[in-house]
C-alpha cells in the first residue's frame, strides 16, 4: 500500500474546488484569445476582436474571483497578504520551496497581465472615456507592449492552470501524490473548459463564425488529448487506482468521461456548428471539467485507513 494512505487530509473545501475550476478557465482563456488575436491578421482581425476583448475581460474577472476564493478558504482570510509581504519589514516574501507561496505570486503576476490586457482593450469598447485614451493606456495598444503582455500573460496563465494540479501532487495524499501527470491533466482540462467558456460567450454575442469555428476546432482536439491524458493518469496510479472502484469511479466514468468528454465529441462530429448544439456541447465540457476536479479533490480527501484496510467516507 502506498504510504500516501497513512497521511491526514488537508480538508480543503468547496472554495478550493471553485478556485481550481475558475483559475483554470481564466488562465487558458487568456492564452487562447492572445493566440486568436495573434493569428487573426488582415481581414480576419476585425471580426475576432470582440472575442479577444471578452476573453481578456473574462480572465481579469476570473483572477479576481480566484483571489477571493483562495483568501476565503484560509482560516484567517485577513492575513492573506502575509503570503506576499513580510509582516515586519514590508518587503516581498517569496518562498520558492513553498507551493502556496509560488501559487500566490503566480496568481498576482497573472492578475497584473490580465489587468493590463483588459485595460488596453477597454478603450475599444469605451472610446469616449478620456482616461482610456491617455498616453499610458494608448501605449499598451502598441504592437510591442501588446505582444509582451500577451506572451508573458499567456505563460502566467498556463502556469496558473497547471499549478492547481501540481499543488495537489506535492501534497502527500492518495491519488494526488501517486502520479506525475496531475499537473498536465489539470492544464489540458483547463484548456478545454477555457475554450468552452469562450465558445459560450462568442455564441451569446453572435460572434464571427470563423472565430467560433476556430474555438470549436481547438476544443475538439484538446478534448481528445484530455481523454488520453486522463487514461494515462489512471494507469500511472497503479494499484492506487482501486480507489476509484467506488461511486467516485462511477462519477468519473459517467460524468467526466461520458458526459464531459465523449458526448461533446459525439455531438460535434462531422463539424456541425449549429449554435444550439455548440452551446450544449460547451456546457457539457464545463460540467465535465468541474466534475473532474471534484472527483480528484474529494475522492482523496475522503480516504482514511482503518487498521490495514482503506475506507472512503
Residue ranges and their predicted role:
Residues 1-17, 45, 74-100, 165-183, ...:
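Membrane-interface interhelical loops and short amphipathic "cap" helices
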Residues 6-7, 20, 57-58:
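Compositionally biased, intrinsically disordered low-complexity regions enriched in proline and serine
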Residues 13, 20-25, 40-41, 47, ...:
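Long, contiguous internal "core" modules enriched in hydrophobic/ aromatic residues
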Residues 25-85, 89-106, 113:
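Membrane helical hairpin/interfacial module
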Residues 29, 33, 78, 126, ...:
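Short helix-terminus and kink motifs of transmembrane alpha helices
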Residues 280-302:
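Final/C-terminal transmembrane alpha-helix of multipass membrane proteins
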Amino acid at each position: 500500500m502506498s504510504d500516501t494512505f497513512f497521511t491526514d487530509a488537508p480538508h480543503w473545501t468547496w472554495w478550493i474546488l471553485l478556485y481550481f475550476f475558475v483559475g483554470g478557465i481564466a488562465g487558458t482563456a487568456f492564452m487562447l484569445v492572445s493566440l486568436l488575436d495573434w493569428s487573426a491578421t488582415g481581414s480576419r482581425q476585425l471580426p475576432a476582436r470582440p472575442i479577444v476583448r471578452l476573453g481578456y475581460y473574462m480572465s481579469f474577472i476570473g483572477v479576481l474571483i480566484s483571489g477571493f476564493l483562495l483568501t476565503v478558504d484560509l482560516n484567517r482570510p485577513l492575513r492573506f497578504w502575509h503570503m506576499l509581504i513580510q509582516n515586519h519589514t514590508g518587503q516581498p516574501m517569496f518562498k520558492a520551496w513553498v507551493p502556496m507561496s509560488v501559487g500566490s505570486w503566480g496568481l498576482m503576476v497573472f492578475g497584473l497581465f490580465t489587468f493590463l490586457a483588459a485595460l488596453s482593450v477597454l478603450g475599444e469598447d469605451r472610446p469616449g472615456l478620456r482616461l482610456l485614451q491617455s498616453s499610458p493606456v494608448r501605449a499598451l495598444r502598441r504592437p510591442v507592449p501588446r505582444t509582451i503582455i500577451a506572451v508573458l500573460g499567456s505563460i502566467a496563465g498556463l502556469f496558473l492552470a497547471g499549478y492547481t494540479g501540481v499543488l495537489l501532487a506535492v501534497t502527500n495524499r492518495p491519488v494526488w501524490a501517486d502520479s506525475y501527470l496531475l499537473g498536465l491533466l489539470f492544464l489540458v482540462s483547463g484548456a478545454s473548459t477555457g475554450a468552452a467558456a469562450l465558445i459560450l460567450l462568442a455564441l451569446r454575442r453572435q460572434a464571427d463564425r470563423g472565430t467560433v469555428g476556430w474555438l470549436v476546432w481547438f476544443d475538439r482536439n484538446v478534448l481528445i488529448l484530455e481523454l488520453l491524458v486522463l487514461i494515462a493518469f489512471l494507469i500511472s496510479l497503479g494499484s492506487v487506482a482501486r480507489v476509484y472502484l467506488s461511486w467516485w469511479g462511477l462519477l468519473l466514468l459517467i460524468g467526466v468521461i461520458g458526459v464531459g468528454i465523449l458526448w461533446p465529441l459525439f455531438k460535434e462530429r462531422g463539424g456541425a456548428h449549429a449554435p444550439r448544439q455548440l452551446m450544449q456541447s460547451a456546457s457539457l465540457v464545463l460540467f465535465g471539467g468541474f466534475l473532474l476536479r471534484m472527483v480528484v479533490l474529494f475522492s482523496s480527501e475522503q480516504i482514511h485507513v482503518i487498521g490495514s484496510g482503506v475506507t472512503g467516507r
